[in-house]
From Swiss-Prot:
Biased composition (Acidic residues): 111-144, 228-248, 273-322
Region (Disordered): 111-202, 215-256, 268-365, 560-644, 657-681
GO biological process, one term: rRNA processing
Pfam families from the UniProt entry: Mpp10
Residue positions where N6-acetyllysine is found in the record: K609
Compositional bias (Basic residues): 577-599
Positions of post-translational Phosphoserine modification: S61, S120, S140, S164, S168, S172, S244, S247, S277, S346
Recorded family membership: Belongs to the MPP10 family.
Protein name (Swiss-Prot/TrEMBL): U3 small nucleolar ribonucleoprotein protein MPP10
Species per Swiss-Prot/TrEMBL record: Mus musculus
Cellular localisation: Nucleus, Nucleolus; Chromosome
Residue ranges crossing the lipid bilayer per the database entry: none
Compositionally biased region (Basic and acidic residues): 145-163, 215-227, 352-365, 560-576, 630-640, 662-681
Subunit record text: Part of the small subunit (SSU) processome, composed of more than 70 proteins and the RNA chaperone small nucleolar RNA (snoRNA) U3. Component of a heterotrimeric complex containing IMP3, IMP4 and MPHOSPH10. Interacts with IMP3 and IMP4.
């Protein structure tokens, strides 16, 4: 009994906690951290409890305990999924096997009112059994004996033949809707219907294709039947009087099996097959309405009760009336075709409905086309001013720049972070200044900057050669220096006298004239706004360095030769200019070399003479050996003044060429002719 008591206590404790939480639903409007921790602990208790009672047939999660310490909600859910998935699969397989088995019937056949009475008695007995079990468990825990009267009551209940099969404690908790289970099995067994063409007569309830298939099925069944059965059916006398028991059993036997469910729970689905499309179902519900459905259900329930309770004669009459009413209700439900104005059953309307049924590819294409159209529209529409590049104040709306977050470069160094070291350093400086009694403000020490010269006041360099001599240039520079000194050394007394005279003349002018003559206008100093365009709009921050406000030409000098170009960018003129520049530099180098030689000759004249003599001797030796030939200047390059001189010169050149061609032949002959005197015997 201990494990049963343990089970009951754990389940009661869990239910108590859940009831406490659900009694106050308004608490769930805010975050309940304590409640969340309680629920996690409850899930752990239930999980561990389930693992203890788990049979070997159902193998759930391999984890014997639910781990919740240092685990988040997602990880706990994953542990529960590991346990639930195989269990659900097991139950699904078991249910499908029982549904497929034709020998098993979910609803046992009962006879008339006895079945209902038995069912109510069984429920009452089950409740009494549960109460007695609870009392026995409590007594067994306390150590007391169970009374014998209760045992007898138990045995009498067990021996009751009308009682339904006994269920265990675990089975008693199961409560499921049989009607839903039947519908699920029908939907599973029902094969997927092939899409058929709609006819003109088709309605929400009536379909021509279904009628044709039903007739074909009936014909096939009739063909399969043997001849003996047909004769037996023909021999039955339909006008015979039938006993009340037989009539009740025969007429309402089938109805009892189906109407074993409570008549209050009967719905449209219990009388008619479900409509294939969801739209048709919703249409039927809307047409009937909740009031009509209730009336029909009550009508059917009343018919069933009256048919069971009344006599045979009354039964016959009521059967006729009920059949008429039933037929009328069926006619009203099944054949209540809509008006021609409400729904158009023409072939054009059917075609439109068939066109509406599109394939997945067509739907994808439609979505793609819509997306392309929207993107094209975005591209063609006018873009906002933020995406239009450089926009001036006139082109954008007023005060629109204030609503945007602008990104710009800070040229000023950020202030240092104040730490303990900086504060201590400041304290030391303050103490030192108090000792030195230096109460004046500290002069800011700045790094000396080279002021960027103004671009507009830049001196233009003159590339022409100066016509003045060096002496004249020095003279002008000297005169300028002397003039500056004389200007600086003005007599201070003269300056004072000039000021006094100016003030006197002003007073005299005021006395001599009717009205006061103002002071003469002093020439104002004009400030040239040589700044970038961004400062004119007053968008730039106040603390920006001067370097950021100057143009690049003001900061760095422009190259004299212009912008740098690559070899591919250079034109013919640029290449010629470079060539001239190289030649000029080469000439300068040669001139410098000659100057150095001359200086050396001047400094060492003896060395230069000896070098010249050595060079001349070397030349003579080379000419003697025949390695070098000296060219004499015979004034050949002198211009010819007459035609006679020209032709004579031409003749001489031809003769020289002929002689040069004959010389190698003579040398060969000399080498070949060997005299006898040179040979020794």
């Amino acid at each position: 009994m201990a494990p049963r008591v343990f089970r009951r206590q754990t389940l009661e404790r869990c239910l108590r906690e859940i009831r406490k939480a659900t009694n106050r639903p308004e608490c769930f409007l805010t975050i309940q951290n304590g409640l969340a921790s309680n629920f996690t602990s409850l899930t752990k208790v239930l999980y561990d409890f389930n693992k203890v009672l788990e049979n070997g047939r159902i193998s759930g999660s391999p984890l014997q305990k639910l781990e919740i310490n240092s685990f988040d909600d997602e990880q706990i859910w994953q542990q529960l999924e590991l346990q639930n998935e195989p269990v659900l699969q097991y139950f699904q397989n078991a249910v499908s096997e029982t549904v497929e088995d034709e020998d098993i019937s979910l609803l046992p056949e009962c006879e008339d009112e006895e079945c209902e009475e038995d069912a109510s008695e069984v429920e009452a007995d089950n409740q009494e059994n549960l109460e007695t079990d609870l009392d026995e468990e409590q007594l067994s825990d306390e150590g007391g004996d169970v009374p014998k009267g209760r045992d007898r009551a138990k045995s009498s209940r067990k021996s009751d033949p009308r009682k339904s099969p006994v269920f265990s404690d675990e089975d008693s908790d199961l409560d499921f809707d049989i009607g839903k289970l039947e519908q699920q099995t029908k939907m599973q067994i029902k094969p997927p219907g092939k899409p058929r063409e709609k006819s003109v007569v088709d309605d929400k309830f009536f379909k021509l294709s279904e009628m044709e298939s039903f007739l074909e099925k009936v014909e096939k069944e009739e063909e399969k039947r043997p001849d003996g059965e047909e004769e037996d059916e023909e021999d039955i006398d339909l006008f015979e009087d039938i006993d009340s028991d037989e009539s009740e059993g025969g007429l309402f036997g089938r109805q009892k099996i189906k109407s074993n469910k409570s008549s209050r729970n009967l719905k449209y689905k219990d009388f008619f097959d479900p409509v294939e499309s969801d739209e048709d179902i919703t249409g039927v519900d809307e047409e009937l309405g909740p009031d009509e459905e209730k009336e029909e259900e009550e009508g059917f329930a009343e018919e069933a009760d009256e048919s069971i309770s009344d006599t045979d004669e009354d039964n016959d009459l009521e059967e006729d009336e009920n059949s008429d009413q039933h037929k009328g209700s069926l006619k009203r439900v099944t054949f209540a075709l809509p008006d021609d104005e409400a729904e158009d059953t023409s072939p054009l309307a059917v075609k439109q409905e068939s066109d509406e049924v599109k394939s997945s590819f067509e739907k994808r294409q439609e979505k793609m086309n819509e997306k392309i159209a929207s993107l094209e529209k975005e591209l063609l529409d006018k873009k906002p001013w933020q995406l239009q590049g450089e926009v001036t104040a006139q082109k954008r709306p007023e005060n629109s720049l204030l609503e945007e977050t602008l990104h710009f470069d800070h040229a000023v160094r950020m202030a240092p972070v104040i730490t303990e070291e900086t504060t201590l350093h400041l304290e030391d400086i303050i103490k030192q200044r108090i000792r030195d009694q230096a109460w004046d403000d500290v002069e800011r020490k700045e790094k000396p900057k080279e002021d960027a010269y103004e671009y507009k006041k830049r001196l233009t360099l003159d590339h022409e050669k100066s016509k003045l001599s060096l002496a004249e240039i020095y003279e002008q520079e000297y005169l300028k220096l002397n003039q500056q000194k004389t200007e600086e050394e003005d007599n201070p007394e003269h300056v004072e006298i000039q000021k006094m005279m100016d003030s006197l003349f002003l007073k005299l002018d005021a006395l001599s004239n009717f009205h006061f003559i103002p002071k003469p206008p002093v020439p104002e100093i004009k400030v040239v706004s040589n700044l970038p365009a961004i400062t004119m709009e007053e968008v730039a921050p106040v603390s920006v360095s001067d370097a950021a406000l100057l143009a690049p030409e003001e900061i760095k000098e422009k190259n004299k030769a212009g912008d740098l170009k690559t070899a591919a960018e250079k034109t013919a003129t640029d290449k010629k200019r470079e060539r001239r520049k190289k030649k000029y530099q080469k000439r300068l180098k040669i001139k410098e070399k000659e100057k150095r030689k001359k200086l050396l000759e001047k400094n060492n004249p003896d060395q230069s003479k000896s070098s010249r003599a050595a060079a001349s001797e070397k030349l003579k030796q080379l000419t003697k050996t025949g390695k070098v030939s000296l060219l004499k200047d015979e004034r050949k390059d002198k211009p010819l003044k007459s035609s006679q001189a020209f032709f004579s010169k031409l003749q001489d050149q031809v003769k020289m060429q002929i002689n040069d061609a004959k010389q190698p032949e003579k040398i060969k002959k000399k080498k070949q002719d060997i005299s006898v005197h040179k040979l020794k015997l």
